Regions:
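SAM cofactor-binding core of SAM-dependent methyltransferases
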Residues: 1-66
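Short, flexible loop segments at the rims of nucleotide/cofactor-binding pockets, characterized by
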Residues: 9-11, 85-88
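Acidic active-site catalytic centers that drive phospho-/nucleotidyl reactions
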Residues: 12, 36, 83, 111-112
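Short, well-ordered coil/turn elements that cap or connect secondary structure elements
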Residues: 27-29, 50-52, 75, 103, ...
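Catalytic metal-binding/acid-base residues of hydrolase active sites
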Residues: 38, 63, 85, 113-114
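Short conserved loop adjoining the S-adenosyl-L-methionine
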Residues: 65-74
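Short SAM/SAH-binding signature in class I
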Residues: 73-82
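C-terminal substrate-binding/active-site "lid" region of AdoMet-derived donor-dependent transferases
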Residues: 78, 86-186
C-alpha cells in the first residue's frame, strides 16, 4: 500500500505497545506521528521504539493529536492508521471527520474492522457504542463520498492474526488505490 500511495508521513492513532509503530518505522523510514492516551502503554511504546529517530510520540487522545497536526501536515500525502479503539471512547468518527476536513488526499486504514462478506476476519464489537463496520460509519460515507476497500484476500488464505480492516480514501485517490492488488472496492 505504501509503495503505491507514496505518503510523506504516517499518522497512527492508538500506539498501544508500539508493535505496529516499530514495524512501520523500520519498513518505511517515513516520519511517524503516533498517539496513545494510556500513559503506561505510551511509556512502554516509547521505550520499545527508542532506537527509531523517525517516530514522534504523543500522550494524547487521537482527536487532539490530529487537530494539532493539521497545519503541519496540510498539503501532504498522509497514510493514516486508525487503531485508537480500545477503552471507553470510540473516536473513529471524529478521526475521520478531522482527516477529511484537513486534506483532499488521504489514505486511511482502520484496523479491527468487520469485513461484512467474510466472517473469518475478526473485528471489534463495543456493544452499545458500536461495532466497527460500515454501518457504524455509513453517515460519513454518504456525507463525504468516502471510497471504501476491503482486503481482496479471503480470511482462510491469511496467515497470522486474521483481523479485518478497511481502507478509506478520498475520491481523488481511487485510481491509485485500485492499483493495489490486495484490495477490492466495497460495493
Amino acid at each position: 500500500c505504501l509503495k503505491i500511495f507514496k505518503p510523506d508521513a504516517i499518522v497512527e492513532t492508538g500506539t498501544h505497545t508500539g508493535e505496529t509503530t516499530a514495524y512501520m518505522a523500520k519498513e518505511s523510514n517515513l516520519p511517524i506521528h503516533t498517539c496513545e492516551i494510556d500513559k503506561r502503554y505510551y511509556s512502554y511504546a516509547k521505550l520499545r521504539c527508542q532506537n527509531f529517530d523517525n517516530i514522534n510520540f504523543y500522550n494524547n487522545s487521537s482527536d487532539i493529536m490530529l487537530e494539532d497536526l493539521r497545519a503541519q501536515l496540510k498539503d501532504k500525502r498522509i497514510f493514516y492508521y486508525l487503531d485508537a479503539h480500545f477503552f471507553d471512547d470510540l473516536p473513529l468518527k471524529r478521526e475521520i471527520e478531522i482527516i477529511h476536513n484537513s486534506s483532499e488526499s488521504y489514505f486511511i486504514m482502520i484496523d479491527d474492522f468487520q469485513v461484512l462478506d467474510d466472517a473469518g476476519y475478526g473485528y471489534d464489537n463495543y456493544g452499545k457504542k458500536g461495532v466497527l463496520n460500515i454501518n457504524y460509519i455509513e453517515d460519513l460515507v454518504g456525507k463525504y463520498d468516502l471510497q471504501l476497500f476491503y482486503p481482496a484476500i479471503k480470511s482462510e488464505a491469511e496467515t497470522g492474526y486474521k483481523r479485518g480492516s478497511i481502507i478509506i480514501t478520498s475520491l481523488c485517490e481511487v485510481s491509485r488505490v485500485t492499483e493495489i492488488g490486495t484490495l477490492r472496492k466495497v460495493k
